[in-house]
Regions:
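Residues that scaffold, gate, or flank divalent-cation-dependent active/transport sites
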Residues: 69
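A positional/architectural concept
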Residues: 7, 12-65
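Glycine-rich hexapeptide-repeat left-handed beta-helix
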Residues: 1-11, 45-48, 53, 59-60, ...
Length: 171
């Protein structure tokens, strides 16, 4: 469901795939070839939420914030992520079930591990690997991680295009 909130209307690029089981409301911008999967809630009632190009927001995730939220290009937000971040840099991956609290800034090409919890206003440098509760930087992203992140994002772009054009995956 896509809804206006007062004079705030979601702006969704025509190439983006939005599941009919997602809920998007308010001042939201979704870039080209991005995808929003079933059960996802994107609620921009306190500030604007901008999602870049080629980004995927997977099933049952929530994006909301106390202020503006900027999600970069080629970002993967895994299943059941609670994301209140101020910024998620290009090419980053937030693992399944992670929690990113208000005001956090995640640098480009970083990995937030599944189940990790990023505390309020935490700043994660580019190409960091963060694990645990609370999240701690455990190392730097390697070339194999970057390739994995690109492969996941491109796979979801392709899958979103298939869903958009056919309504189902070809097996």
């Amino acid at each position: 469901m896509i809804r206006n909130l007062g004079d705030k209307k979601p702006v969704i690029h025509p190439t983006a795939f939005i599941s009919e089981a997602a809920y998007i409301v308010g001042d939201v911008v979704i870039g080209k070839h991005s995808s929003v999967w079933p059960g996802t809630v994107i609620r921009a009632d306190n500030g604007k939420i901008v999602i870049g190009d080629g980004t995927n927001i997977q099933d049952n995730s929530v994006l909301h914030g106390d202020a503006d939220v900027q999600i970069g290009n080629g970002v993967t937000i895994g299943h059941r992520v609670m994301c209140h971040a101020a910024e998620v840099g290009d090419g980053s991956l937030i693992g399944n079930g992670a929690v990113v609290n208000d005001g956090a800034k995640i640098g480009a090409r970083s990995i937030i591990g599944s189940g990790a919890m990023i505390i309020e206003n935490m700043v994660i440098p580019n190409e960091s690997i963060v694990l645990g509760v609370p999240g701690r930087i455990k190392g730097n992203v390697k070339e194999r991680h970057l390739r994995m992140q690109i492969d996941i994002a491109q796979g979801y772009q392709k899958r979103g295009s298939i869903y958009k054009s056919q309504g189902q995956l070809e097996l």
